[in-house]
């Protein structure tokens, strides 16, 4: 079977309902926390480390929920949502690889914010570069990522870590 290498909004919504990788496996959050509209490219090869990459996008409109509350009179997308989107994509990569279990963010190394997403922006692009995938008792991916708005890089994160767990009871 050939793996799919791009995913639409509807595909991602299916993933949020647990329908893409099967029950109990990697699942994206539902809207409003789903911070991705499409994955334009996903591969087991390529990226900075030759171990896989993802490119995904979020369309920006002034009526997105977070602009109304962060901050009143000074609307800006919270940086933590961009960071969470990168974790979402690393977890998606694990599910796409066929690794069983529910995804959980496990941390990151250095995170830098040097720009912002305003309501006037059109598109956020996420670039994820897989550094390592551990398979065994613990299934986990480690990646570096970046967030760009309208073609300008504004956040970076090193050492994004996400694991998938068949039981999260004792997590």
Swiss-Prot record:
Pathway: Lipid metabolism; fatty acid biosynthesis. GO terms for biological process: unsaturated fatty acid biosynthetic process. Keywords: Cytoplasm, Fatty acid biosynthesis, Fatty acid metabolism, Isomerase, Lipid biosynthesis, Lipid metabolism, Lyase. InterPro entries: FabA, FabA_FabZ, HotDog_dom_sf. The keyword Cytoplasm applies. Its main location: cytoplasm. Its EC number is 4.2.1.59, 5.3.3.14. Homodimer. PANTHER family: 3-HYDROXYACYL-[ACYL-CARRIER-PROTEIN] DEHYDRATASE, 3-HYDROXYDECANOYL-[ACYL-CARRIER-PROTEIN] DEHYDRATASE. HAMAP family: FabA (MF_00405). This is 3-hydroxydecanoyl-[acyl-carrier-protein] dehydratase. The lineage of its organism: Bacteria, Pseudomonadati, Pseudomonadota, Gammaproteobacteria, Pseudomonadales. The gene is fabA.
